[in-house]
Amino acid sequence: SINLFDEFIVDLEPQFLLQRSLKGNTKSFVKLGDSITGDKVKRETTLKDYFALNSQIKGKINNWKLETDQQISSFDSEKFSEALRFNSNLSKNISFFNSLWNKSFYGIYRERVWNGSIGETEIYLGYGSKLKKQNTWEVNGIRKTEILSFGFANIKAEALNNNNLVTSTKGNLFYLLDQKFPIIVGEPSNIFVDSSYRYIPKPIKRGLSLQTKLELLYSLYDSGNNQQYVSLGAGPEIVYGNFKKKSFDYTKISVLPIYKIKSGDSPFKFDQISDKFTLDFTYDQQLYGPLILKSSAILNLDSDSKDYGDLINSKISLNWKKRSYEFGIFYQPHNEAGGISFTLFGFK
């Protein structure tokens, strides 16, 4: 990290792309001269393609929080427009209707989006603003999370039915209510964290609960298009163990069927509502000591979809979990992508 002035920090992550250097080619770019939305083809690599750079800038401007992320996947000037990805976000908390909201302005250049059975698509260029309120609270043991947001943006992205780029302004309203109802509760023997809690930052709430999810969305586009849906889901979650013993002392399983009632269409691929019926599944299992296996998947149960019965989103990770941090490697079979994750606990 580099301290830039008093209020800004720059994180730089140079990368050497070993696979490209060994193979001598890459399928990360379109044919020279083709549209940026064209099909990726095999292209020969040079020394400039073996290096990449991820960077992040964080800081404050008066009462606003600024974050920018940049990715450069090649230093070849002929590929630079494809190799560069950028997003920025300027936000602050405000008081609105006697509630605390987060107000943000953002800009995007070439952001990848995975949209269920539609697959990977891309926002080529976009800028906009969002007003969002999020609250989490507990009443009689029932944990609730509520999100309400309003957004307005100008977006250039892949069209819904072809690879052409189309531009449209978009306004949207989104509401979510998650609830977790305890059915069988196993209270921890000690509510205080002591030396026996080597792997977790706080005692685990064991038992059986019913989780429910309600989502509402309405989107309007200047092309005259509009789309909306109501999403309902309910399913069990089981948590067993204390994560204190050496092995197999923690298991978490959740199953959540979700059904969407939708109408209308988007002009874009990235936000088109798809997959009316899905099954969300998660499974976490302590293996030995701080080593934990985590997995999640979304199964497409929409009988009208060409991907009926397929996993449209999936992730497997092997993590090293300690009280103050969690580090792991992950792989996503649905898009054959992987990486490294790192989380700190107890920091805001």
Predicted ranges, named:
Residues S1-K348:
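Long, low-hydrophobicity, solvent-exposed regions enriched in small/turn-prone and acidic residues
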